[in-house]
Amino acid sequence: MYNISDVDRNFVISTGMKRDDIRFFDARNDPFRLYGLMFENGRFCRMTNSAAKNVSDAVFRLNRNTAGGRVRFVTDSEYVAISAKMDNIGRMSHFSLTGSAGFDLLYSKDSNGDLLYKKAFVPPYDMKDGYESVIDFDSRKKRVVEINFPLYSDLISLNIGLCADCVLEKAPDYKIDKPVVYYGSSITQGACASSPGKTYQSIISVMLDCDYLNLGFSGSAKGEQAMADYIKNLEMSAFVLDYDYNALTIQDLTETHEKMFITIRKAQPDLPIVILSRPKCLLNEEDICRFNVIKKTYDNAVCFGDKNVYLLSGSYLMNDLTGNEGLVDDIHPTDVGFMSIARNLGNLLKEIILK
């Protein structure tokens, strides 16, 4: 047996900084701007710990996963480094470590331009409590930088390393500053994207220049009333409801789906709500039954005069680019699958938010 990095240097993962002029900053402090996360009890989380605990033990644990977390800033540094401390590393055989436990970087060509994907801060395979990594630019000029956080790992601290003499400023606001809130399953959380910036929420965020909150809870999105009561009070530009395949049975889905929709609709009568079904083209009998349950939620809302509810089937979401080939394991999307979802859902969100 041999190590591929011994024969192909492109697979060597460098974790040393090797920068004499580096200065580190805590990502929680100004002028850095944190999105999609809060900081409680010494760690990052996606909703308050008390609210998560009130939903279920599983949601309380997964709440520490930093899916959808981002930090944004403007700098002219020739490089951006990270030093991350993590106390839970998500490792799965069908999920790239750069996605489950890595950070990646998006940037603009100037201080106000559209974001472009640069690359991942690739973690070492054997890391135990975090890692350090650096990404270089080929020139020194002011640009917006966005660092996406790991999808399935827990983060205690993040320090960002920049040239000691660099410009460091607050990033401009998102064009759509009220977040789109996504609630759902492992797919919503980001499995199995190759890096955090490849999830459909991140792609849509770049498409629309919008903030977002990822409330995907792997295997644990059951449409609980406690979760509905938490979400209904959030300030948001749109809500995406996507958990049909996490309900244990069709009966469970029937008992919770419309109830969750109504809870949020009563609290926010004018909020655009998009209902999704599982992203899959080749449906079995149970898939069809589950789709019929969520379609009934939609049909009933329309019947009662709701003009701000929308339904996108999973087969429609996937057919744009990929069909069923966009799934890793007949459940979780590949990067191409996420892109297909992002195109179709993003076009709808653009229409309904910006109308």
Question: Which residues make up each language-model segment?
Answer:
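N-terminal secretory targeting modules
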Residues: 1-179, 346, 350-355
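Serine-esterase "nucleophile elbow" of acetyl-processing enzymes
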Residues: 137-139, 145-221, 225-235
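Structural motif
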Residues: 146-148, 240-242, 274
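Active-site-proximal beta-strand/loop segments in catalytic clefts of secreted hydrolases
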Residues: 184, 215-218, 242-245, 276-279, ...
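A general structural detector for well-ordered alpha-helical segments in enzyme core domains, enriched
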Residues: 200, 256-260, 290-297
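Oxyanion-hole/transition-state-stabilizing segment in secreted/luminal serine hydrolases
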Residues: 204, 221-259, 263-267, 278-283
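A short helix->loop->beta-strand "cap" motif at the edges of active sites that frequently abuts
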Residues: 268-273
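Catalytic His-Asp segment of secreted/periplasmic serine-dependent ester chemistry enzymes
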Residues: 283-355
